[in-house]
Swiss-Prot record:
Listed GO MF terms: bradykinin receptor binding; calmodulin binding; chloride ion binding; metallocarboxypeptidase activity; metallodipeptidase activity; metalloendopeptidase activity; metallopeptidase activity; mitogen-activated protein kinase binding
Domain called Peptidase M2: residue spans: 44-627, 646-1225
Keyword terms: Calmodulin-binding, Carboxypeptidase, Cell membrane, Cytoplasm, Disulfide bond, Glycoprotein, Hydrolase, Membrane, Metal-binding, Metalloprotease, Phosphoprotein, Protease, Repeat, Secreted, Signal, Transmembrane, Transmembrane helix, Zinc
Cytoplasmic side: 1281-1309
Bilayer topology annotation: Single-pass type I membrane protein
UniProt binding sites for chloride 1: Y235, R532
TM region positions: 1260-1280
Protein name: Angiotensin-converting enzyme
Length: 1309
């Protein structure tokens, strides 16, 4: 609200309001004598003498007012001590002038002036005789002036500084104003609001109390009960306060509906925590420091966002509008009505922009009358915005008023009442803001005239006009209470009582009587009456309606534009030229036909949006008002440190769009470099990988740091919040550059050591892991040959990786801590978004343990039968090299040794595949066919052209570990696999194709969401299909199994084969990250890496090393995922949920019968469920994806137990028949190959459980194992009882399993 000079009255009592000293006042000047020429002469004490008195006063007053105004202008446009001193000198002269002329008027005319026949003369004498502060003694007058100066200085120089910093401080204009207008960060808005109210308000309170006492003392001498009574007298109505209350209540329903609608929109933005739909709105969220107008949050509340924007700020900037042009456009509007142009002095002397020469100025927009009938100016720190364009018209309205009444007596050069002066410019702004007018002046390309556009426009106007009404009403309600003595000493309590009562807003932080929040509003310390604005907001719509009628407008009032109507201009001119020479009621009646303030034109103007708001609020079930009026919002987290965080969702959307666009390029280049290296291991390829890793890290850091500028806690859009939280995690890129380079090099060196390693015979024949050692471990039944391969691989790979691993752990932990996690394990577990992940996983493991222990006991007996008692102890752990796999993670390769019914039909399709000439490509074509049979997507041409489906024969070194690749361009997806034509690799092919299908289903999501719902989901999809592929029914359908036998023995054989793959894997997949998590949290140190590894393998798998291992060995490093830093618990999760998926999809496919016989091939309904879940990617929490597939959101082992129920029953019977002991009570047994007699000569070391340890380590180990043994014995006894009852239990039961988050590596293993 422009409230400065344009709203100052020229009569003496308010001349002190011109004192705006922004610097500490200089020493009080010596008393200045008023020039004798300005002293009143001798006049007769009658009406004729009074006429002469008024004429003489007019000429003298113009001189004094010009000098005083010029001094104030000089100070406000260049705040210096010298200008402050000159301003105060001029103010003192003005007060002395007021005193001598006022006292003269009282002495001569007090008995008779109210009986003068001239109404105009009565009005002039009435003004002159009211002295105001000039009634005070000279000492109190100086005290009064000093209080005004200091209050103005405190307000004008107050600043809010950034927390813990002094360099970054914000002034109200433009910094804090812009923050309140544009920020959507709850915490930043709070800091700006609280900072300003503290900085400006608190120091003012004692000064305002003293000012109030002096002001009341002065006006009581003029016959008023207090200052408020004088202010109200300017409206010359005995029922003024009652009229105002009537008007307010007439408008209140419209405000309440607007309030409820806006509150609902703010609730969408800030959520339940900060917005109570039954309470007041926190006062800092409405786009304005005082919540007096809400148009700055229009973007948050716009009814129909698809309609063209009505904020033409961007058009003004694009068209090159500057500040001068804005004022020329406003001037042209006035002249188009036949009103006066601005005089040359206006353009020569006004300050229309904030000076760039370093001067301190008072930026508050104001219009100035220099009382010489030619010099009129505006002071405004204008910015090129639509909002400021309205302010320009408002201020120029004041100047037009000055121009029109400049020939009136100086005492009558004011508005008909104070509200008139504020209304004139705003009347024109009502026309200027219409889409039709904006089109006329080239700021809107098209005028969209439809109902939705009208509602948008009217709501935008309501945010400015209706939202202001209660604030415009309450400010002086509070001050009148202060002046009357009703409010003190509870200034702040009453201020917030009124603001809650009328506005429905509340303070966002605790406020008390040490605060003085009313003082944070310009008009309070600058002693500018405020009820004028409430009056003006009523009047301007009365004026607008009358002028539109005069202009011949037809149609809704809100569409009227009086531009170029000279008839409207003539009517307006009559009001302006009258000044205050006539009662305002007469002037108003001449203008609108009625002499009373009337809210009906305002209600008519907003009628369409009023009805729309009522309907919206009823539809939303919103409560009008704030019944929970005592509610206050909580303090935000991380306040005030997090104030610079951004919660503006529009800005956040732009950020994630840019991140997504750039990420696709960077990730594609990173994937290509890694692919080239993995399919051709060379030094040049290694160098390129490191370059792209650095590029990727830089990208991650750049956007991660940018993402950390967003306040995700206060972003309400779920998708935005989820994306930004993920981008904020810099992962390894959080490391300093040198350490990041070192980290990347360590990973590359470890992975290279793993990938190129080979084990050589004495004759120099060397075997690589793929396919040589893998085939040997799968097919050999020679104890010694298996031992050679097992030991050779670990000696070659593990020992090579060990030197790198401690540093890798250190850097992984450092990166995790830099990302806000406790250690690397904590960071990995965070992907599952579960506070009790470890406990939930343990529960799942315990549910599956009976199945594993029975399988372990059965397989151990079979191995005992094959290898004999010297190699197998029926009550001890199994040597780890005998289970058909380098890591004993799956045992399906020893199926021939453990087959329950050897005479039953064989189900291994490997031989048929070879005999039928299957190739690796044929295997993947078959997998692709399975997916398409479900109605899922076929792989694109790029897949067949670019994948590496076989180990190259050209001598290239490659990483053979099977993996699926997403190149992040929406069309390039590949698999890298050294495929062997056998049944096992056919299953692997389906597993990897499951990853590819997942990639294709979520390819249109933002990059951030192109991951599985949780890491286990991505691993499970292909395996779900493999459960069908493995069934005899499906193998027959693809001609890989000819036998039609499908009896009990075949069922048990099939389930045994599946259990060797699925059940045997459960403890290994569980323990790998149990070990790593403990390494990361330092409960396992580098001195006992290997010892703890084998402790866990013994505890969970019941395995022991076949040869003595020492701490110089590093057997975990012999598993791909350890040197490659790939989290492993995902596989444990995937092996459980794949059975849940299988069970649900089988139901969808209409399968009847045992779960293990289900084949979902060609079921479109099963495919639809899978596709719906995969399309979500990571965009929703994983329970939602689980719900789409299974109909419930939890992870449970029950489906897996159901699947293997027939086998478990058979195993329990078979183990019981042989008297097998479940578990490994002789846990300290080691095979002959691992035994060495006594101590290691000359070393002081001993052999313990196959480990080469210090004697003290061995002693500790013995005690630990004794404790484990007792525990295991108790557990075994309990387990035996449980197993006898388990056959009679219904395994289908609801289980509230863990709820996982997700994160996918670039390569899926």
């Amino acid at each position: 609200m422009g409230a400065a000079s344009g709203c100052r009255w020229p009569w003496p009592p308010l001349l002190p309001l011109l004192l705006m000293l922004l610097l500490p006042p200089p020493p009080l000047p010596v008393a200045l004598a008023l020039d004798s020429a300005l002293q009143p002469g001798n006049f007769t004490a009658d009406e004729a003498g009074a006429e002469d008195f008024a004429q003489s006063f007019n000429s003298s007053s113009e001189q004094v007012l010009f000098q005083s105004t010029a001094a104030s202008w000089a100070h406000d446009t260049n705040i210096t001590e010298e200008n402050a001193r000159r301003q105060e000198e001029a103010a003192l002269i003005s007060q002395e002038f007021s005193e001598v002329w006022g006292q003269k008027a009282k002495a001569l005319y007090d008995p008779i002036w109210q009986n003068f026949t001239s109404r105009t003369l009565r009005r002039i004498i009435g003004v002159v005789r009211t002295l105001g502060s000039a009634n005070l003694s000279p000492a109190k007058r100086q005290q009064y002036n000093s209080l005004l100066s200091n209050m103005t200085r405190i307000y004008s120089t107050a600043k809010v500084c950034f927390p813990n910093k002094t360099a970054t401080c914000w002034s109200l204009d433009p910094e804090l104003t812009n923050i309140l207008a544009t920020s959507r960060s709850y915490t930043l808005l709070l800091y700006a609001w609280e900072g300003w109210h503290n900085a400006a308000g608190i120091p003012l309170k004692p000064l305002y109390q003293d000012f109030t006492a002096l002001s009341n003392e002065a006006y009581k001498q003029d016959g008023f009960s207090d200052t408020g009574a004088y202010w109200r007298s300017l409206y010359d109505s005995p029922t003024f306060t009652e009229d105002l209350e009537r008007l307010y209540h007439q408008l209140e329903p419209l405000y309440l509906n607007l309030h409820a609608y806006v509150r609902r929109a703010l609730h969408r933005q800030y959520g339940d925590r900060f917005i109570n739909l039954r309470g007041p709105i926190p006062a800092h969220l409405l786009g304005n420091m005082w919540a007096q107008s809400w148009n700055n949050i229009y973007d948050m509340v716009v009814p129909f966002p698809g309609k063209p924007s009505l904020d033409v700020t961007s058009a003004m900037v694009q068209k090159g509008w500057n500040v001068t042009h804005m004022f020329r456009v406003a001037e042209e509007f006035f002249t188009s009505l036949g009103l006066l142009p601005m005089p040359p002095e206006f353009w020569a002397e006004s300050m229309l922009e904030k000076p760039s020469d370093g001067r301190e100025v008072v930026c508050h927009a104001s219009a100035w009358d220099f009382y010489n009938r030619k010099d009129f100016r505006i002071k405004q720190c204008t910015q090129v915005t639509m909002d400021q364009l309205s302010t320009v018209h408002h201020e120029m309205g004041h100047v037009q008023y000055y121009l029109q009444y400049k020939d009136q007596h100086v005492s009558l050069r004011r508005g008909a009442n104070p509200g008139f002066h504020e209304a004139i410019g705003d009347v024109l702004a009502l026309s200027v803001s219409t889409p039709a007018h904006l089109h006329k002046i080239g700021l809107l390309d098209h005028v969209t005239s439809d109902w939705e556009s009208d509602i948008n426009y009217l709501l935008k106007m309501a945010l400015e006009k209706i939202a202001f009404l209660p604030f415009g009403y309450l400010v002086d309600q509070w001050r009148w209470g202060v002046f009357s003595g009703r409010t003190p000493p509870l200034y702040n309590y009453d201020w917030w009582y009124l603001r809650t009562k009328y506005q429905g807003v509340c303070p966002p932080v605790v406020r008390n009587e040490t605060h003085f929040d009313a003082g944070a509003k310009y008009h309070v310390p600058n002693v500018t009456p405020y009820i004028r604005y409430f009056v003006s907001f009523i009047l301007q719509f009365q004026f607008h309606q009358a002028l539109c009628k005069e202009a011949g407008h037809q149609g809704p009032l809100h569409q009227c534009d009086i531009y170029q109507s000279t008839r409207a201009g003539a009517k307006l001119r009559a009001v302006l030229q009258a000044g205050s020479s006539r009662p305002w009621q007469e002037v108003l009646k001449d203008m609108v036909g009625s002499g009373a303030l009337d809210a009906q034109p305002l209600l008519d103007y907003f009628q369409p949006v009023t009805q729309w708001l009522e309907e919206q609020n009823q539809r939303s079930g919103d409560i009008l008002g704030w019944p929970e009026y005592q509610w206050r919002p909580p303090m935000p987290d991380n306040y005030p440190e997090g104030i610079d965080l951004v919660s503006d969702e529009a800005e956040a959307s732009k950020f994630v769009e840019e991140y997504d666009r750039r990420s696709q390029v960077v990730l594609n280049e990173y994937a290509e470099a890694n692919w080239d290296y993995n399919t051709n291991i060379t030094a040049e390829g290694s160098k390129r990988v490191l370059e792209k890793s650095t590029q990727m890290a830089n990208h991650t850091v750049k956007y991660g740091i940018w993402a950390r500028k967003f306040d995700v806690a206060n972003i309400q859009n779920f998708t935005l919040k989820r994306m930004i939280k993920k981008i904020q995690d810099l992962e390894r890129a959080a490391l300093p550059f040198k350490e990041l380079e070192e980290y990347n090099q360590i990973l590359l060196d470890m992975e290279t050591a793993y990938s190129v390693a080979s084990v050589c015979h004495a004759n120099s024949t060397c075997l690589q892991l793929e396919p040589d050692l893998t085939n040997l471990m799968a097919t050999s039944r020679s104890y010694e040959e298996l031992l050679w391969a097992w030991k050779g691989w670990r000696d070659k790979v593990g020992r090579a990786i060990l030197p790198y691993f401690p540093k890798y752990v250190e850097l992984t932990n450092k990166a995790a801590r830099l990302n806000g996690y406790e250690d690397g394990g904590d960071a990995w577990r965070a992907a599952y978004e579960m506070p009790f992940l470890e406990q939930e996983l343990e529960q799942l493991f315990q549910e599956l343990q009976p199945l594993y222990l029975n399988l372990h006991a059965y397989v151990r007996r079979a191995l005992h039968h094959h290898y004999g008692p010297e190699h197998i102890n029926l009550e001890g752990p199994i040597p780890a090299h005998l289970l058909g796999n380098m890591w004993a993670q799956t045992w399906s390769n020893i199926y021939d040794l453990v087959v329950p019914f050897p005479s039953a039909s064989k189900m291994d399709a490997s031989e048929a595949m070879i005999n039928q000439g299957w190739t690796p490509q044929r295997m993947f074509k078959e997998a692709d066919n399975f997916f398409t049979s479900l109605g899922l997507l076929p792989v694109p041409p790029e897949f067949w052209n670019k994948s590496m489906l076989e180990k190259p024969t050209d001598g290239r070194e490659v990483v053979c570990h099977a993996s699926a690749w997403d190149f992040f361009n929406g069309k390039d997806f590949r698999i890298k696999q050294c495929t062997t034509v056998n049944m096992e690799d056919l299953v692997v092919a389906h597993h990897e194709m499951g990853h590819i299908q997942y990639f294709m289903q979520y390819k249109d999501l933002p990059v951030t969401f192109r991951e599985g719902a949780n890491p286990g989901f991505h691993e499970a999809i292909g395996d779900v299909l493999a459960l069908s592929v493995s069934t005899p029914k499906h193998l027959r359908s693809i001609n890989l199994l000819k036998s039609e036998d499908d009896g009990y023995e075949e069922d048990i054989n099939f389930l045994m084969k599946m259990a060797l793959d699925k059940v045997a894997f459960v403890p290994f997949s569980y323990l790998v990250d149990q070990w790593r998590w403990r390494v990361f949290d330092r409960s396992i140190t580098k001195e006992n890496y290997n010892q703890e590894w084998w402790s866990l393998r013994l505890k969970y798998q019941g395995l022991c090393p076949p040869v003595a291992r020492s701490q110089g060995d590093f057997d975990p490093g012999a598993k791909f995922h350890i040197p490659s830093s790939v989290p492993y618990i995902r596989y444990f999760v995937s092996f459980i949920i794949q059975f849940q998926f299988h069970e649900a999809l089988c139901q969808a496919a209409g399968h009847k019968g045992p779960l293990h016989k289900c084949d979902i091939y060609q079921s479109k309904e099963a495919g639809r469920r899978l596709a719906d879940a995969m399309k979500l990617g990571l965009s929703k929490p994983w329970p939602e994806a689980m719900q789409l597939i299974t109909g419930q959101p939890n992870v449970s082992a029950s489906a897996m137990m159901t699947y293997f129920k027939p086998l478990l029953d058979w195993l329990v019977t078979e183990n019981g028949r042989h008297g097998e002991k479940l578990g490994w009570p002789q846990y300290n047994w080691t095979p002959n190959s691992a035994r060495l007699e006594g101590s290691f000569a000359g070393t002081g070391r001993v052999n313990f459980l196959g480990l080469n340890l210090e004697e003290q380590q061995a002693r500790v180990g013995q005690w630990v194992l004794l404790f484990l043994g007792v525990t295991l014995l108790v557990a075994t006894m309990g387990l035996t009882q449980r197993l006898f009852s388990i056959r009679h239990q219904i395994l289908r039961r609801t289980h509230r399993g863990p709820q996982f988050g997700s994160e996918v590596e670039l390569r899926h293993s």
